[in-house]
UniProtKB/Swiss-Prot annotation:
Region (Thiamine pyrophosphate binding): 441-521
Pfam assignment, any one: TPP_enzyme_M
SUPFAM superfamilies named in the record: DHS-like NAD/FAD-binding domain, Thiamin diphosphate-binding fold (THDP-binding)
InterPro entries found in the cross-reference section: DHS-like_NAD/FAD-binding_dom (IPR029035), Myo_inos_IolD (IPR030817), THcHDO_hydrolase_firmi (IPR023757), THDP-binding (IPR029061), Thiamin_PyroP_enz_cen_dom (IPR012000), Thiamin_PyroP_enz_TPP-bd_dom (IPR012001), TPP-bd_CS (IPR000399), TPP_enz (IPR045229)
PROSITE patterns given in the database record: TPP_ENZYMES (PS00187)
UniProt: Mg(2+) binding residues: 492, 519
Similarity comment: Belongs to the TPP enzyme family.
GO BP, one annotated term: isoleucine biosynthetic process
Function: Involved in the cleavage of the C1-C2 bond of 3D-(3,5/4)-trihydroxycyclohexane-1,2-dione (THcHDO) to yield 5-deoxy-glucuronate (5DG).
Organism the protein comes from: Clostridium botulinum (strain Alaska E43 / Type E3)
Listed name of the protein: 3D-(3,5/4)-trihydroxycyclohexane-1,2-dione hydrolase
EC identifiers of the protein: 3.7.1.22
GO CC term, one of those recorded: acetolactate synthase complex
Keywords linked to the UniProt accession: Hydrolase, Magnesium, Metal-binding, NAD, Thiamine pyrophosphate
Taxonomic lineage from the root: Bacteria, Bacillati, Bacillota, Clostridia, Eubacteriales
Length: 643
């Protein structure tokens, strides 16, 4: 048996370089590179291996460990989970910084390989710099915190353990039903220790991503439900995107006259102009989808997790006879809501079910309802995009601090409303541009208002809704699709939380366009707070008032364009729609990353449409407005499913 003496880290690099995936007969390299921020716990181990021979892996220099891991997640997502960039860090704080990104990847079922350094396996120098010591268990390190947020976790305490650890890591990373974050913890001494690794460990491995078909019994059980239903609705989830099942879903829906509601993850799997596509569904959904969903007697969930935002906390479907049918690779997700399930690939299952329903001559009983719902939403879209600031202006959101809007207007001299800005942006940028989002009020506006005609052009992280994802993910999406314009759309709150990978985008000459909506606060949480009877507390960006000792002083102005200019970006400030349009046009011409600081009036985002969100309200309060909000919530909850 032939073997080669190598360090653990050298063997890891060689192994990663030989991983491939095959999908629908197309073979592709799986691991394209490694993000890293070197520290003492990784630089002389894995760092030495990469310096000696990176093979065909590209090394990227991150600026923040969470940021680089978000970029890697977005790279994998934009590649439909068939390409990854691994992430390595030092021990302690560097590793801990990646925990949030690990959770983000796992919630969204996106493959993310994390390689954090760890304290010494021998324990000889304990406590090493940045090591946590727990008196009840010396085996615990910072890296144990990855366990709850990863789909696979391992620690390589001996060089020979690397083999089983990495084979299992690849098993999970390439499994569409189980994928998510994988953490392989690398003690810093073990990284440099050597072993006679067998050559067969380094052979080219092609991980086949297959299209399993549900068993026949499941199909016929679901068929018997569907054929007796008159008003079904399909929920298009992220599984449709990753299965590349958009065409199959469109044909299925149009053949049987079944309307489609999109989740955040499923959006852009099919065209917005598709006659059956009603658009976003649920809490952040639009009027068309939610009105149709309310009366549906059957919900067909395709590749969806049925999150609370999709089901409006299980209150959206009000027909007492409603039943649920699912197509999902994951039996766990397929079984939710007491669904009759088909456990398998979305495309294969849709095509097989299509043939079965065709034999039954099935057609839904909808007449003009689908078309009328789409027309009504088009009219609402026109209204939203044409909302302008004028005398006696009343913003969309009614629950608010009355003074905030005029104070912000006076401070910035802006007249831009959030919905009109989004309408203009959609009009100005190319159809095949990729937009990236994650948090705040913008995902709701985008799910409702953004129309997609180009496949996979809508990149939204709304499983973990992680503030700070947007810019790093914009960079990751650009790495995945360098020929397209990428726009990271985010609020000032999210920008302030994390924007470090802007520097990496400049370093790599990968242009990202940042559309920063500045309304001087955490706008959507302020809406949630005040709409439930609570006061305006710590959700606007205000100075501490020396007289009241509270955060109710004046608004804090920030010149985001000026700050970003210092990083080397081409920047703009927009205070009216003409300035915004000119900035968008000029930004397209630039070769370097850009930032448009869009000053948007508070409370001018969209509101909900026929939906409710279950949040944990106070049962008792001295404020009658809070008590009233709780009573209303309790009333709605009575009509929602219990599980």
């Amino acid at each position: 048996m032939k073997s080669t003496k190598m360090t653990t880290a050298q063997a890891l690099v060689r192994f990663l370089d030989n991983q491939y995936v095959s999908f629908d007969g197309k073979e592709e390299k799986f691991v394209h590179g490694i993000f890293t921020i070197f520290g003492h716990g990784i630089v002389v181990g894995l760092g030495q291996a990469l310096d000696e021979n990176t093979r065909d892996l590209k090394v990227y220099q991150g600026r923040n460990e969470q940021g680089m891991a978000h970029a890697a997640t977005a790279f994998a997502k934009q590649n439909n989970r068939r390409k990854i960039i691994a992430c390595s860090s030092s021990i302690g704080p560097g590793a801990a910084n990646m925990v949030t990104a690990a959770a983000t990847a796992t919630v969204n079922n996106i493959p993310l390989l994390l390689l954090p350094g760890d304290s010494f396996a021998t324990r000889q120098p304990d406590p090493v710099l940045q090591q946590i010591e727990q008196s009840y268990n010396l085996g615990i390190t910072t890296n144990d915190v990855f366990k709850p947020v990863c789909k696979y976790w391992d620690r390589v305490n001996r060089p020979e353990q690397l083999m089983s650890a990495m084979i299992n890591a690849m098993r999970v990373l390439t499994d569409p039903a189980e994928t998510g974050a994988v953490c392989i913890s690398l003690p810093q001494d073990v990284q440099g220790e050597s072993f006679e690794f067998p050559e067969y460990f380094f052979k080219k491995r092609v991980h086949k991503i297959t299209r399993p078909l549900a068993v026949e019994e499941e199909f016929y059980e679901c068929l018997n439900i569907i054929k007796n239903k008159k008003k079904p609705i399909i929920i298009c989830g992220g599984g449709v995107r990753y299965s590349e099942a958009g065409d199959a879903l469109s044909k299925f829906a149009n053949k049987f006259n079944i309307p489609i509601g999109e989740t955040q993850a499923g959006k852009s799997s099919i065209k917005s102009s598709d006659p059956m596509n009603l658009g976003g569904i649920g809490v952040t959904g639009n009027l068309a989808s939610n009105i149709i969903a309310k009366d549906a007697d059957l919900v067909i969930g395709v590749g969806t997790r049925f999150s609370d935002f999709t089901t409006a906390s299980k209150s959206l479907f009000k027909n007492p006879d409603v039943e649920f049918v699912t197509i999902n690779l994951s039996k766990f997700h397929a079984s939710k809501l007491d669904s009759c399930k088909m456990v398998g690939d979305a495309k294969e299952c849709l095509e097989y079910l299509h043939k079965l329903l065709e034999k039954e001559n099935y057609i839904s009983s909808y007449k003009d309802e689908i078309k009328d719902a789409k027309i009504a939403w088009k009219e609402e879209m026109k209204r939203l995009t044409n909302i302008k600031y004028e005398e006696n202006f009343e913003p969309i959101i009614k629950f608010r601090n009355k003074e905030s809007l005029e104070e912000f207007k006076k401070l910035t001299d802006t007249t831009i409303t959030q919905t009109s800005a989004l309408g203009l942006i959609r009009e100005c940028i190319d159809d095949d541009s990729i937009i990236v989002g994650a948090s705040g009020s913008l995902p709701g506006d985008l799910q409702r208002m953004w129309e997609t005609e180009s496949l996979n052009s809508y990149h939204m992280e709304y499983g973990y809704s992680c503030m700070g994802y947007e810019i790093a993910a914009g960079f990751g999406a650009k790495l995945a699709d360098p020929e397209k314009e990428v726009y990271s759309i985010l609020g000032d709150g999210s920008y302030l939380m994390l924007h470090s990978e802007l520097i990496t985008s400049i370093q790599e000459n990968k242009k990202v366009n940042v559309l920063l909506f500045d309304n001087c606060g955490f706008g959507c949480i302020n809406n949630l707070q005040m709409s439930n009877g609570i006061g305006n507390l710590a959700t606007e960006f205000r100075y501490r008032n020396s007289e009241t000792n509270k955060l109710n002083g004046k608004l804090i102005p920030i010149d985001f364009a000026k700050a970003a200019e210092g990083y080397g970006l081409k920047t703009y400030t927009a205070k009216n729609l003409e300035e915004l349009k000119n900035a968008l046009i000029d930004a397209k011409k630039q070769k370097v990353s850009t930032l448009i600081d869009i000053k948007v009036l508070p409370k001018t985002m969209t509101d909900g449409y026929e939906s409710w969100w279950h949040v944990g309200l106070a049962e008792v309060s001295e404020k009658e407005s809070v008590n009233e909000a709780f009573k209303n919530s309790k009333k709605i909850l009575k009509g929602a499913r219990k599980y």
